[in-house]
Amino acid sequence: MNADKRIDGWLHDLDRLLDQTESLVKRGRASYDTDPALPLAFEALCNRVGDLAKKLTAADAVTFVDTRWSQAARTRDFVVHQYHRVDSDVLWETVHTSIPKLRPLIAEIRRHRRGAVS
């Protein structure tokens, strides 16, 4: 599989994760605070989004140069390696506010990639 197909697949995976993120966030902060499964799901989302951000920046550092990609990767590293220090308020903010900001970046990258192919 060539690099372009891998990138397309990773962007598709990221779209799916962002949809799942949106669905979980819609449950609300009160559910997040009372359902012990939701913070764990948020940690898993941070892990997966950050892992994809790492793959995308490694595959094409010029296209995936926006600092939000590296922030997602660093968040992943923190959540995975410092899980005992994860602050629930910061985790909520990250999944509620920061991760959704990747969606317009994905749309912009897709427009750019379609233009480059045409």
Regions found by a protein language model. Give the residues of each.
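Solvent-exposed interaction patches of small proteins and small membrane subunits
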Residues: M1-S118
